[in-house]
Amino acid sequence: MKKIFAVLGDPIEHSLSPIMHNSAFEALDMDCTYHAFRVEKNDLENALQGAKAMGFGGLNLTVPLKETALKFVDADSLAAKIGAINTIDFKDGIKGYNTDGIGAKRTIEDEGVDIKDKNVLILGAGGAARAIAFTFAEAGANVNIANRTPERAMQLAAEIGDAKGYGLDIVDNGLEDIDILINTTTVGLGNSNGTLVTAEQMHSDLAVFDIVYNPLMTKLLQEAETAGARPITGIMMLVYQGAEAFRIWTGKEPPINVMKKTVMETLDI
């Protein structure tokens, strides 16, 4: 019997998860299918119980359901710290995970950049920043967070423990002591062509990762190129967070190259 997987959210029409996961199932000749369903916050508990009752293999969650889901699932320790769920597995109850930070970590490691003991500066203090900050702290990075509202950055840093929070003006002094710069804000998304950091503030040993993947080469990454730094695009974070969910659900090694090719073709990159 065909196993069903899905992503839930509102809005959901934009999601690339169905085409990415269906390409993976097809590549491994698995009798599975992946769909997208619009689910509002107030309906999430019923949706989770319904999916479990109908024998779904697993779910992904996107905006605005990630935080709400904590009330209804058995979250693993990392997801509980992050305070958000993006992956649900039904093999043993309703288990919740967060693979966003893992997606970012694998993307950067793919570029040959080791995270342990590195000084990381994360721009933003929202959901993606939380996932990346906690995951990188667990991996042994020295985490720094800069946010438009410094209090939010300091609050997140305090939750992590061994981290520091600042206002965005921290970048004005230059990034000589930073090894990895990560943008988790929406600055640079779409046609905005904005950046929070310029080439003059960077150095050539810096790795610059932007989780925005549309456009692929954001203004921030263009500035990184100008500075002779290493630009890392956000597209593989999307692929790797999905690949980790695939691994959790199926126990199989996901076909990363197939998933990447499908996403890039869909985005016409």
Curated annotation (Swiss-Prot):
Entries under CDD domains matching the protein: NAD_bind_Shikimate_DH
GO molecular function: NADP binding; shikimate 3-dehydrogenase (NADP+) activity
Binding-site residues for shikimate, renumbered to this chain: 15-17, 62, 86, 100, 213
Active-site feature positions: 66 (proton acceptor)
Known EC number: 1.1.1.25
Pfam families: SDH_C (PF18317), Shikimate_DH (PF01488), Shikimate_dh_N (PF08501)
InterPro entries (alphabetical): Aminoacid_DH-like_N_sf, NAD(P)-bd_dom_sf, SDH_C, Shikimate_DH, Shikimate_DH-bd_N, Shikimate_DH_fam, Shikm_DH/Glu-tRNA_Rdtase
Top-tier EC class: oxidoreductase
The UniProt record lists the keyword Kinase: no
Biological processes per GO annotation: amino acid biosynthetic process; aromatic amino acid family biosynthetic process; chorismate biosynthetic process; shikimate metabolic process
Alphabetically ordered keywords of this record: Amino-acid biosynthesis, Aromatic amino acid biosynthesis, NADP, Oxidoreductase
Binding locations of NADP(+): 124-128, 147-152, 211, 234
Catalytic activity: shikimate + NADP(+) = 3-dehydroshikimate + NADPH + H(+)
Pathway note: Metabolic intermediate biosynthesis; chorismate biosynthesis; chorismate from D-erythrose 4-phosphate and phosphoenolpyruvate: step 4/7
Record has Amino-acid biosynthesis as a keyword: yes
Role of this protein: Involved in the biosynthesis of the chorismate, which leads to the biosynthesis of aromatic amino acids. Catalyzes the reversible NADPH linked reduction of 3-dehydroshikimate (DHSA) to yield shikimate (SA).
Family: Belongs to the shikimate dehydrogenase family.
Subunit structure, as described in the record: Homodimer.
Protein name: Shikimate dehydrogenase (NADP(+))
Organism: Methanococcoides burtonii (strain DSM 6242 / NBRC 107633 / OCM 468 / ACE-M)
